[in-house]
Amino acid sequence: MAGPGVPGAPAARWKRHIVRQLRLRDRTQKALFLELVPAYNHLLEKAELLDKFSKKLQPEPNSVTPTTHQGPWEESELDSDQVPSLVALRVKWQEEEEGLRLVCGEMAYQVVEKGAALGTLESELQQRQSRLAALEARVAQLREARAQQAQQVEEWRAQNAVQRAAYEALRAHVGLREAALRRLQEEARDLLERLVQRKARAAAERNLRNERRERAKQARVSQELKKAAKRTVSISEGPDTLGDGMRERRETLALAPEPEPLEKEACEKWKRPFRSASATSLTLSHCVDVVKGLLDFKKRRGHSIGGAPEQRYQIIPVCVAARLPTRAQDVLDAHLSEVNAVRFGPNSSLLATGGADRLIHLWNVVGSRLEANQTLEGAGGSITSVDFDPSGYQVLAATYNQAAQLWKVGEAQSKETLSGHKDKVTAAKFKLTRHQAVTGSRDRTVKEWDLGRAYCSRTINVLSYCNDVVCGDHIIISGHNDQKIRFWDSRGPHCTQVIPVQGRVTSLSLSHDQLHLLSCSRDNTLKVIDLRVSNIRQVFRADGFKCGSDWTKAVFSPDRSYALAGSCDGALYIWDVDTGKLESRLQGPHCAAVNAVAWCYSGSHMVSVDQGRKVVLWQ
């Protein structure tokens, strides 16, 4: 037989397959014919025997028939017993033949049945053989697939081993990096602490030098005053008689912009103590009072922590009486999304709006229209608060990117970023100087900033979120989420007073005389607090008034005669501060909750902004 590698191998395989199939068929079908074949052979033997016996008996009738024609004398010669025996034998053989025929018929019927059964079994065998072949092919496929799967599993195991090794290496590397990061953070904290301590020492030294210089100046002036008290001084009305201090005061007043007709009268009243007609006959005591006033003015100017001189801007009262708005004059879709903050500049003709689109738009109020002036860009998050410095040349904004940012009017990009908070900054306000600011945040801190160096000079830790802040001469007032208003002395480290209110505080507004504070809270009320006695003087409510958010702003009118706030239904509510009654309800073009309102310093118009991108000018 040819080997498996030669060309005759396929022919040998199918021959062996046929032999195996025949042997299998012989084993399975042999048992069915073990009884049938011997019986059939026995039947054939009997049939052959009967055939032979029949052939022997065939001539006997011929031999018997002639005897019937013999005469009577011949019948006597036959044996009387021979004829019955032959007849009986024939009958017997006929009976046996019939029985054998029946047996042959039965056997033939059984052969037919067995043949039919054999055909059925052969068809079943073929079906089973075909099914077995299909199953064998399927088994071969499954074995091949199993081999492939096993190979793939081995490959995956190898890849997993490689990945595990790489992961362990990366884990070790990350551990080293984290350890290095912790060391660097500790070093950074140490450096920051040393830097803060060094800056604090430097600030203390500067303050000490300034204090010594001030004490020396006061001592020198005191000596000069003592010398001047011993002689009589005659002062004329000329411009040089009041000394350098008076000239400086006049120069400061000369820098202010020329007032409007209504402002001139107030300015003249404000300047009148320095231009009195009795100046030609001043006595020595009057001269001393004037010099002391000038010295007190210089002392109030002071210096910042960093040593840079602070300018205080006198707010000239230009609002004789605020006028209630009656109608909307201009409506603009100013921002791409909701508008959160609005503020008028000191000259009442410049307006700033800030929104969730990270932009601050400056507008000129021209008659009864708002005209676009400039767009301030570069904010790192949604604008939550805007404020002008006393000169009107800088804009400070609080943003959601954990910082406050400073712009100069006329420059589109941010000038300075005040970073240090750990959560959203909700309020940012200038103090009464352009060099200092205060911010409040949701990280439960209030921070004071020296803007000359962009340095946090003080951090106040509070127990609740800060939603708004306002600043006085020497006081910082903050409104919080725990339904409390806190007062902080800028010259001391601790809280000086806490006033509880019902509802989370959303905004604060300080009157121009710094004697009254207006708060808005989520209990849908406005409260007027008298700062002289530190108690709540008035509570304003109205049917339909409801705060729309945690940053809804309410403001005083410039003359403190009215309180203004916007509601979630888009209406504006105005209360009379003296009587506590609702003076007016303005239902205008707002279709969404009003977030903030602003009343210009002249009292002639106001602006409201809402969550639907609208800015509305009222007059």
UniProtKB/Swiss-Prot annotation:
Miscellaneous comment as given in the Swiss-Prot or TrEMBL entry? Although ATG16L2 is structurally similar to ATG16L1 and is likewise able to form a complex with the autophagy proteins ATG5 and ATG12, overexpression and knockdown studies in mouse suggest that ATG16L2 is not essential for canonical autophagy.
Instruction: State the superkingdom.
Output: Eukaryota
Q: Which UniProt keywords apply?
A: Coiled coil, Cytoplasm, Protein transport, Repeat, Transport, WD repeat
- Spell out the disulfide connections: none
Q: What is an example of a Pfam family matching this protein?
A: WD40
The answer to whether UniProt assigns keyword Protein transport to this entry is: yes
Name of protein: Protein Atg16l2
Q: Which residues form a coiled coil?
A: 116-227
Q: Which Gene3D superfamilies match?
A: YVTN repeat-like/Quinoprotein amine dehydrogenase
**Feature: compositional bias, Polar residues:** 60-70
* Localization, UniProt: Cytoplasm, Cytosol
Q: What does this protein do?
A: May play a role in regulating epithelial homeostasis in an ATG16L1-dependent manner.
Q: Which family does it belong to?
A: Belongs to the WD repeat ATG16 family.
Region (Disordered) location: 57-78
Q: What is its main location?
A: cytoplasm
In which ranges do the WD repeats occur?
334-373, 378-417, 420-454, 455-498, 500-539, 546-585, 589-619
Give the record's GO biological process terms.
Answer: autophagosome assembly; macroautophagy; negative stranded viral RNA replication; protein transport
Record-linked InterPro entries: ATG16, Autophagy-rel_prot_16_dom, G-protein_beta_WD-40_rep, WD40/YVTN_repeat-like_dom_sf, WD40_repeat_CS, WD40_repeat_dom_sf, WD40_rpt
Q: Self-association or partners: how does it assemble? A: Homooligomer. Heterooligomer with ATG16L1. Interacts with ATG5. Self-oligomerizes to form a 800-kDa complex composed of ATG12-ATG5 and ATG16L2. Interacts with RAB33B.
The organism named in the record is Homo sapiens (Human)
An example of a Gene Ontology cellular component annotation for this protein is:
cytosol
